[in-house]
C-alpha cells in the first residue's frame, strides 16, 4: 500500500516530491490540498538546477548548451536577473575573442605617451588618483570606465559601495573611487609642469558635469567651442558624441566616435560609447557586437558586461522564447552561425533532477579562430538598407549612413531594422589589432593622446617637490594614502604604529592599515628615477647603511624586554607597543628575522643574559597589532646596552656549552642525563590532566632523548623545554640559562624535580 506523497526539503534547499510517482512528460504528482505549493516548489528546484547547469556549461565553453539551459530556466520561472548571466557573458566574450583572433589589450608602456599620461586613456593625467596597487589613473577614467581591475597589473580596484535598496547591483565603482582623493604630489607636479594641459582638463571636467546633469545643449555648445581651439583632442570628441547622443542626433554621435576610433582603434571605451549610441537608436544586434568588441579588448570593462547581460536576459526571456527567438536576434551572437536556436528538449519537456546532470553536449564551441571578412559591428539584417553617402564632417572622415534612420523622428523604424553602419568600419586582424576598411587616411601624428608629456624643462625640476613631509628627505619607496598624501613607506608605517590616521590631514586610515599593502606609487618612483638619479642614489646609499646597521647580530641587537626565552622552545608574542611594532618590522625587513629576549631588571633595564628569538610567522591584526610566532635560538650575554627609536639594543656575545673530552666524564654525564630525563618524564606524567594539557597546548610535547649530548652549543632540547614549564622563579631560570656546563644544568634541574616530586607524593 503506497503512502501519500509528502514534500520534503533537500539539503540544497530545493523541494522534492517523495513517495509519489511522477510522469515523464507531465506535471509533478502531489496529493492533499497543497498542490499549488508543491508544484511551485518543484518548479523552483527545476529552474535552479537549470541555472546551475547553464553556469557549468558556460564555464566549460559550451555556449549553445548554456544558452539553452538559461532560456529553459527563465521559462520555468527563474527571476530575470541579468547578474546571474555573468558566466554566460564570459563564455560569449571568450568565444568572440577566439573567433576574431583577439587578445586582451593591456595598458601601453609609460614611455609611449610620457610618464604623466593616464594608463587607461593615454591622455593627460588630470586629477591623478593612485589606487591601492600603486598605479595612477586620471579621475575621469576611473569614474567613466568603472573598472573592476587595474589595467596594468590586473589587481582588483576598491569594491563599490553596498547596493541600495531595490538595486540588484552595487552602484558604480565611481562611488568607491570618490573615497580616493586626488594625489596631492602628482597633481601639484601636473599643474606645475603642464598648466595648459591642466586647464584644458578642467574644461573637459566641466563638460562631464554638464552631461551628468543632462544639460546636453550646453554641453554640445561647450564641446564645439573647445574643439575649435583643440581640434585634435579626442576626449572632447567623446564628450561631443555623448552630447549628440543625449539629443538623439545619433548620426553625428557616430561620426565623432568613428573619428576617435580612427586615431585609437583599440580604445575599449569608444566601442562601448558607440554601442550605447546604437542601442539607444534601436540597433540591438549592432550594439551587442560593439559591447563584445569592448569586452574582447578589456574583459573588465564593467558597463559593457552589464549591457551584454541585460541584452542576453531580454533575448532569453520567455516572451522571446515563445516567439521562437527570431533569427535576427541570434545572428549577432558569435559562434551561432546556423539556424536560430530552438530549445525542444530542454524547454518543452519537464525533466527530473537526475536528467539535468551535466552531460557532454553534442555541439561544441569552435576552437579555431576564423578570419573575419565583414564588419564586426554589422549584423545580418532581415531587410536590405540602401545607404546614401553623407558629406564629410570637419574631421575629414566620410560616413555612409541612412540619414532618416539616424534621426530622432525615425526611431520607430530603427527598432525594426538593422543599421548598415559606416563605410569606414572596424575590422580585426589576426594579430589582434583593429584597422579601418578605408585605407586612404591614416591616423594623424599630432593626436593629443600621443604627446610625450615627459619632456620637462630642467628649471622646473625641484627636489623639494619630491620630499617626504615626515623625514624631510627625498621619497624612498613612496606610498600614497587614500586621502591623497604621499610619504616614504617606512615613515608612514612608523606613524601608523602610533595612530591609524594620516599624519597630515588626520583622516582615518584604519582600512588602509588593515589591508597592509603599502604598494609603492609607481609613477612617483619613476619620476624620481628619471629626473633625480643622483639624489636618489645618495638617498639609497643612506638607506642601505641604515639597513646594514640594523642587520648586525652582535652589535646593536634589538632587545625585547618581556619574558624568559629558551633555545628550541616556542615563544608566542602579542606585540602592541609602537616601539616593538617597529622592532619586529625592521627584523623582518632586514632579513635577519631575529631579536633578543630578556627579562626586565630594576637596575639595568634588562637582565645580563637572554636568548635570541627567530621569527617564524607574523599574523597582523586589523588595528596594527600582531601575534608573532617565534622560537628560541642562541643564548647570549649582554656586553653593552643602548637605545634606538624607543626600544632597547645591546652588544652581545653568544654562549656555548663547554665540551667534555674525557671518556669517564662523558659516561658520568650520560648516566646523569638518563637519570634526570627519566625523573622528568615521571614528574610530567604525574601532573593533573588539566595542567598537562595546558603545557602541551602551549609548549608542545616534550622532546625526545638525544644520543649525542654535545651535538649542539646549547645541549639537549628537552632540558630547555622542561625549564620553561617548571613553575620556578625567573631569577632561578635565568641562572640556569647562563650556565655553560651541561652537567651543572642537569644537576640544577634534578634538584628542582626532586623538590616537586615530593609535593606530588603528598
Swiss-Prot record:
GO terms for cellular component: cytoplasm. InterPro entries: Lon_prtase_N, Lon_prtase_N_sf, PUA-like_sf, TPR-like_helical_dom_sf, TPR_rpt, Znf_RING, Znf_RING/FYVE/PHD, Znf_RING_CS. The modification Phosphoserine is found at residue 420. It comes from the Eukaryota. The keyword Phosphoprotein applies. Residues 1-35 are annotated as: Disordered. SMART domains: LON (SM00464), RING (SM00184), TPR (SM00028). Residues 547-757 form the Lon N-terminal domain. Disulfide bonds: none annotated. Transmembrane segments: none annotated. Keywords: Metal-binding, Phosphoprotein, Repeat, TPR repeat, Zinc, Zinc-finger. GO terms for molecular function: zinc ion binding. A zinc finger (RING-type) spans 118-154, 468-506. This is LON peptidase N-terminal domain and RING finger protein 1.
